[in-house]
Structure formats: C-alpha cells, structure tokens
Swiss-Prot record:
A motif (Nuclear localization signal 1) lies at residues 11-18. This is Ribosome biogenesis protein NSA2. Pfam families: Ribosomal_S8e. GO terms for cellular component: nucleolus; preribosome, large subunit precursor. It comes from the Eukaryota. Keywords: Nucleus, Ribonucleoprotein, Ribosome biogenesis, rRNA processing. It is found in: Nucleus, Nucleolus. It comes from Eremothecium gossypii (strain ATCC 10895 / CBS 109.51 / FGSC 9923 / NRRL Y-1056). Involved in the biogenesis of the 60S ribosomal subunit. May play a part in the quality control of pre-60S particles. Residues 18-39 have a biased composition (Basic and acidic residues). One of its GO terms (biological process) is maturation of LSU-rRNA. The gene is NSA2. Belongs to the eukaryotic ribosomal protein eS8 family. Ribosome biogenesis protein NSA2 subfamily. Residues 1-39 are annotated as: Disordered. A motif (Nuclear localization signal 2) lies at residues 51-58.
Amino acid sequence: MPQNEYIEQHIKKHGRRLDHEERKRKREAREAHKISEKAQKLTGWKGKQFAKKRYAEKVAMRKKIKAHEQSKLKGAAKPLEDSGEALPAYLLDREQANSAKAISSSIKQKRLEKADKFSVPLPKVRGISEEEMFKVVKTGKSKTKSWKRMITKHTFVGEGFTRRPVKMERIIRPSALRQKKANVTHPELGVTVFLPILGVKKNPQSPMYTQLGVLTKGTIIEVNVSELGMVTSGGKVVWGKYAQITNEPDRDGCVNAVLLV
C-alpha cells in the first residue's frame, strides 16, 4: 500500500467509529446552514465567485428536474404502420407500449401500497441526544478513564445474551433496565395483551440504537402474537408481528405498544 494511504489502511485494520454514520449524517445536515451563512457573509470577489457557483448549481438542478419531468410525460411511441416502410427487427417492438415504463409504474404503486399498509401510529418522534442516552462511566485506579458508557434507557437483549468481559465492555446495558415483554394493543379488536418481545426492528433515533436494542418512543419491535391465534390466508399461524412503542418506557417503567395490522 502506498505511504500516503495511511488513513485507508487504518480504516481497514481497525474499522470506523461507532458513531461514524451519525456524525456523517449530522455533517451533511449542517451543510445547508454553512451555505446559507456563506451566502450572507461573503463579500467582494469571494462573494461574487460563490454566487456564480451557486447559480450554476441551481441551473443544473433545474435542467435535471425538467428532464425528469419530460421523461415522465413521454408515453408509448406512435405506431409507424401508415408510412408503409419496412421496419428492421430491432424496431418492431416500438409499436407496443413501453413495458419498462409499465413495470416501473407497477413497482412504484406496490411500494405506495406497502407504505400505506405499514403506516405507523407515530410517524414523528422527538430526537434524543447522546448526552441523554449515554452516561459516562469513570474507570481505572484513579477514575480518570472515561471510555465506558452506560445506557440510561430501557433495552431489549435476546435470550442467549451474555455480557462481554468487564475490561472490554464499552457499552453497558443495566439488568434493571432490560425489558422482555410489552403491553401490546390490537387497534381493531381493542384488546391489550402482555406479549414477549422477539427483537428490535427499527429505532428511529439511530441505527446504532437499533443494534443495541434500545427501546424508546416510536421504536418498531417484533412481538410474539401466537397467543392471539392470528392466521394467514393460507391457514398458517402467525408467529411474529411488528408493533410500535407509544410511550416512554424509561418514565413509565413498562413498554406499551400498538400492533401494526
């Protein structure tokens, strides 16, 4: 490997930070604010150059949007039967409707139906900062090291979960804040059942919190609904189904969720 690629070498050897994706997302979100600040504060030659660059970017974006809209408006090609000219083999399918367009439209429609099917009760939730989520744990003989973190929210860990050795465990999930069951409400039947949690599907705060199994408001969890006796159209018993947490478990001490049907 060349000498100047030491950063790539370090990434391959040690990997990235645990919060790399979150930092990248925040950096990208700040870009708009930085551009706005530059547009307001830059003066003179630098201001002119910046305005020229932004103008070129906006023109390119408008052209791209216009081209995309034009491609949507174009339908099937007109048949050329009246011309009386013989067509080569590779142009014979021009008379038929554009199959690729039809397939694309059907895929989009299916996605919309799927999104409607799995629409959640809480589409937006409050963001949680890392300072609120993690508590710094001081370690070492003189308590000067602070690389350990303890999660302050309720979490879910699987059945066969075992903690890492104490000296290697970076993130601690306290036993007192672990949840195994949830109060799940069926929206159509109007009944609430105490069901075991199978796993955490998606935490809206961060992919890292999903991996750690953190249970916060708006989290999608998978619960065991075999007790409800739900069956599929084929007659098979439904084992697991998704539900969304509607309360704040760290305040209430329990997990309340609504089944996604």
